[in-house]
Amino acid sequence: MKREDCICFSGSAGGAEAEFGAAAERYGIDEVNFTFEGHNNARLRGLRVLTKAELRHGDVSLGYLSKLMHRKYPDTPMFRMVLQTIWHQVDNGQEIFVIGKINPDDTVTGGTGIAAEYARLFNRPVYVFDQVRSGWFRWNGDAWEN
């Protein structure tokens, strides 16, 4: 695959998102960072500020998401907008790479766990670097495989 055929879709947050973006920049890969007004952006390269209408397009029921992920999420405007930007990242991506911990129920812990779940729902190839097991895993449709 050629670097000019790749784009790193991210959310401009610190941590793993910023590191993926920095790696993309080092290797000459285009970068699009979905964000919203008022978000604290760690990456400014390729910043794409979503409109309110675009954010609404990525809206997901918190009740549905909580049931799917087996955890409770805050019902705040800021959290909803973060979820909506994650939806846009996954919707635009062809393959999804996240960092976190794979749980016994096959969900992934951490903010990127939501991206992994969206990827599974959108039938996108998804890869998780499990920080506990120090290795990459791929979702095969039924389970995570090393």
Regions found by a protein language model. Give the residues of each.
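Acidic/glycine-enriched connector segments
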Residues: 1-145
